[in-house]
């Protein structure tokens, strides 16, 4: 319950307060101006949300009340949905020192003033003298709730910036891309989205009022990205319930805490059940979260406690609580329960993806989906095949190296037309160091060259399925690459799965096939195709598809 603290008739207030108290509401006084900063006697011990102080920190007047309202809303969300959002989350500032250090310093200092609960990270400030700088940076990146990429003109040339971008993408950390001046997007080997979320001139950081506006924009966009990513975690609870069935029960629905009581396997004599509790987080869990959960369950008879997140974490333990990613938790339990079967190692699944035309925040859903599908495909024993894409190829290479470090080249097949490679043997050798490379013939024009490459990539006996995501929508449908790839697959009776929820051309195609009952696309159930149409649980989607393909004769 929120109390806007102006002059209120006392009787009305007391009735209201009594009712709120009886309902066990959390009462938050709001001091609208300097004269009303002390709450009434009944709630004088409660700390107020100070509107005047929020305005003062930003050098703003009362015309900027909507800005403060957004800040207040984030505070309320952190209280009501503590597993999805935390005000004190870490904001990692990624930059190149040679041309980004000064603006990063100004940004860091202003965030520290305007968002006092937040934890910004800047290597020069947060890495102590004598520490292993890269080890600290790697740890802080993994802990971060949002990754702010300050794209200055020289940052695209930095291998360190490339490493940080790759790390954030593969760890499912929301990335806010902030373009500075005329930074060239073409120099980025990895792009977090199709284009930058925000753009500013470096001189804007010299102006106090403009700097305040920049910080507010960054905080607003960061919040949107964090919540968009966090809300995806809600989908995972159903996926885990499906694998555990009646063996899982709800311990606390609001806190997303669940209890597994599972039969033990692999021993001749009777044993007690495995008793495990897990809690799902959308944000990055920390030591306080682990301690709180451990304390909450201290009187329960159990074997283990796990905090799970939809970010990709390195497995760790804090206060006897295991911190792990949801997909790894699912993977290990699936192995234990015998529900995970390796596919035919000589078969491939082709993944076709391109950024759609949409708000930059939601384009990251495509990258998330591609990463989750790629991991699931390789883990299931299939080879991942794709047509060259300058952004996604680096991600696929890294995923293969993580999943199969000893044999990663044989897990990735990349097709490229010589129209784009143009007999560049140096680039071809670089690609061969990361994958099995197939170069198709250069034709008379770009369109014909792409068609030739797509035929070579898709129309082969060892292609098990085609997965389509995103893509640009064209006025002339024949120019849409996804439609051509689907037709090529259908000619060979190769099952096609179209992910609609990432937007773009695949959303249009999925809608068209849904209206015809998914005829000619694949022989999977309407239920599975409907999931591909509008669901956002991409990991579960991939698992369901792989289960269907593994069971195909």
Protein language model regions, located:
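Short, hydrophobic/glycine-enriched beta-strand segments
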Residues: 91-95, 345-356
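Conserved beta-strand-loop-alpha-helix hinge of the TIR/SEFIR fold
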Residues: 1-37, 98, 137-187, 261-319, ...
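Conserved BB-loop
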Residues: 1, 6-9, 108-138, 153-161, ...
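A short acidic (Asp/Glu
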Residues: 40-41, 103-105, 159-161, 188, ...
């Amino acid at each position: 319950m929120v109390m806007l603290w102006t002059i209120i008739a006392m009787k009305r207030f007391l009735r209201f307060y009594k009712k709120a108290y009886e309902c066990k509401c959390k009462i938050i006084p709001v001091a609208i101006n300097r004269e009303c900063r002390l709450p009434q006697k009944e709630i004088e011990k409660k700390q107020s949300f100070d509107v005047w102080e929020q305005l003062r920190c930003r050098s703003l007047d009362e015309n900027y009340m909507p800005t403060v309202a957004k800040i207040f809303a984030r505070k309320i969300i952190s209280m009501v949905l503590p597993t999805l959002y935390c005000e004190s989350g870490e904001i990692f500032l990624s930059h190149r020192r040679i041309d980004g250090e000064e603006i990063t310093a100004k940004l860091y200092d202003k965030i520290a003033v305007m968002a006092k609960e937040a934890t910004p990270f800047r290597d020069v400030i947060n890495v102590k003298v004598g520490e292993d700088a890269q080890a600290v940076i790697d740890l802080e990146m993994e802990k971060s709730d949002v990754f702010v990429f300050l794209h200055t003109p020289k940052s695209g040339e930095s291998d360190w910036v490339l490493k940080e971008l790759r790390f954030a993408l593969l760890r499912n950390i929301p990335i806010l891309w902030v373009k500075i001046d005329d930074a060239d997007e073409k120099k980025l080997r990895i792009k977090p989205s199709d284009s930058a979320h925000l753009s500013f001139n470096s001189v804007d950081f010299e102006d106090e009022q403009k700097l305040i506006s920049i910080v507010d924009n960054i905080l607003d966009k960061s919040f949107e990205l964090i919540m968009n990513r966090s809300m995806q975690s809600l989908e995972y609870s159903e996926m885990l319930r499906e694998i555990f069935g009646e063996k899982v029960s709800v311990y606390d629905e609001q806190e997303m805490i669940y209890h597994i009581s599972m039969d033990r396997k692999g021993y001749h004599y009777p044993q007690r059940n495995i008793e495990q509790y897990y809690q799902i987080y959308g944000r990055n869990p920390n030591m306080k979260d682990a301690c709180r959960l451990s304390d909450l369950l201290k009187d329960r008879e159990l074997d283990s406690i796990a905090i799970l997140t939809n970010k990709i974490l390195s497995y760790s333990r804090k206060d006897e609580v295991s911190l792990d990613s949801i997909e790894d938790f699912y993977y290990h339990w699936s192995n234990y329960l015998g529900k995970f079967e390796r596919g035919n190692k000589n078969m491939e699944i082709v993944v076709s993806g391109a950024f759609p035309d949409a708000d930059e925040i939601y384009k990251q859903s495509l990258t998330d989906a591609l990463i989750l599908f790629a991991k699931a495909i390789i883990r299931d024993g299939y080879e991942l095949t794709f047509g060259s894409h300058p952004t996604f190829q680096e991600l696929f290479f890294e995923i293969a190296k993580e999943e199969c470090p000893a044999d990663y080249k044989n897990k990735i097949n990349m097709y490229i037309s010589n129209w784009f490679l143009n007999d560049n043997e140096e680039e071809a050798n670089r690609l061969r160091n990361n994958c099995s490379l197939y170069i198709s013939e250069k034709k008379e024009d770009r369109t014909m060259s792409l068609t030739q490459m797509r035929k070579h990539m898709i129309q082969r006996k060892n292609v098990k399925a085609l997965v389509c995501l995103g893509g640009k929508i064209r006025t002339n449908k024949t120019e849409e690459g996804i439609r051509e790839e689907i037709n090529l697959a259908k000619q060979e009776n190769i099952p096609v799965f179209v992910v609609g929820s990432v937007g773009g051309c695949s959303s249009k195609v999925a809608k068209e096939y849904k209206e015809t009952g998914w005829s000619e696309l694949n022989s999977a159930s309407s239920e599975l195709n409907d999931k591909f149409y509008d669901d956002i649980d991409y990991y579960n989607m991939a698992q369901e598809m792989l289960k269907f393909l593994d069971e195909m004769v």
